């Protein structure tokens, strides 16, 4: 595969575009655009039918989408900073068995969207400052059999939105200072939340369904007012995070 390493790109329509290129490495590049309107701007790192690509330690600002994966199975994004892009910091579709780890996605127009994929692992990322009615720290749509662990969601209008997502392991994440920390659509199911921290959010959990189809156990809630008489580390009274106003 190819190697694109340590370059500087300024005001390119598409800075790095890989099409049907297998096993490439895109590392340590500095990509910046002036932030033109979305329809006149392309993506920073764009993968199309490029399996096994590694996107590592790049900085991307002001593009349409910072990083775009489509039909690129088995690829990895690690240690990138994608911020201030017009649409998504990461836009990811139809790419099974991928990992993205230790990336920072900050102040992107619509946040991050991961869609229509299986076996995706999201570990140790920061989803920060996605603000607006259509902005999400992370949108997971039609994602199955994946993991969302050790991530930070902070300062977003909505931290995490799950729509049509199932069989996800959602564990040890921090949700702080979001409008809605987690929004679960009725189509999201069988995705247990364990060991997560919910602090200083306007609303911790909301849903458009009468029942939650995913379990919450062993999480920390700043709004919990119960007690732990047996001192086993878990509250003796269940916490119910969904409030009426979270549904409005």
PLM regions and their residue ranges:
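Generic detector of contiguous secondary-structure segments
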Residues: 3-26, 100-117, 178, 182-188, ...
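Short, flexible active-site-adjacent loop segments at beta-strand->alpha-helix junctions, enriched
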Residues: 8, 22, 30, 51, ...
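Parallel beta-helix/beta-solenoid
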Residues: 4, 16, 20-21, 26, ...
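Extracellular beta-strand/beta-solenoid scaffold signature
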Residues: 1, 10-18, 38-48, 62-68, ...
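Short, conserved, surface-exposed binding loops centered on an aromatic residue
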Residues: 113, 150-151
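Functionally critical loop-and-helix segments that line ligand-binding/catalytic clefts
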Residues: 3, 127, 131-137, 154-155, ...
């Amino acid at each position: 595969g190819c190697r694109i390493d340590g370059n500087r790109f300024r005001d390119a329509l598409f800075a790095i575009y890989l099409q049907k290129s297998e096993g490439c490495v895109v590392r340590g590049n500095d990509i910046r655009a002036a932030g033109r309107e979305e329809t006149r701007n392309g993506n920073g790192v764009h993968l199309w039918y490029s399996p096994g690509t590694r996107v590592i330690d790049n900085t991307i600002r002001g593009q349409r989408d910072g990083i775009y994966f489509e039909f690129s199975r088995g690829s990895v994004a690690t240690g990138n900073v994608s911020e201030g892009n017009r649409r998504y910091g990461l836009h990811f579709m139809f790419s099974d068995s991928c990992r993205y780890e230790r990336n920072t996605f900050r102040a992107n127009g619509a946040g991050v969207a991961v869609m229509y994929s299986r076996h995706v692992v999201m570990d140790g990322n920061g989803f920060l400052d996605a603000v607006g009615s259509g902005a999400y720290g992370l949108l997971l749509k039609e994602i199955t059999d994946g993991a969302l662990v050790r991530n930070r969601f902070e300062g977003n209008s909505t931290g995490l939105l799950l729509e049509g997502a199932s069989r996800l392991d959602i564990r040890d994440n921090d949700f702080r200072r979001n409008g809605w920390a987690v929004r679960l659509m009725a189509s999201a199911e069988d995705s247990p939340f364990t060991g997560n921290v919910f602090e200083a959010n306007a609303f911790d959990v909301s849903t458009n369904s009468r029942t939650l189809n995913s379990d919450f156990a062993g999480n920390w809630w700043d709004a919990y007012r119960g007690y732990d008489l047996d001192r086993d580390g878990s509250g003796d009274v269940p916490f119910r995070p969904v409030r009426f106003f979270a549904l409005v």
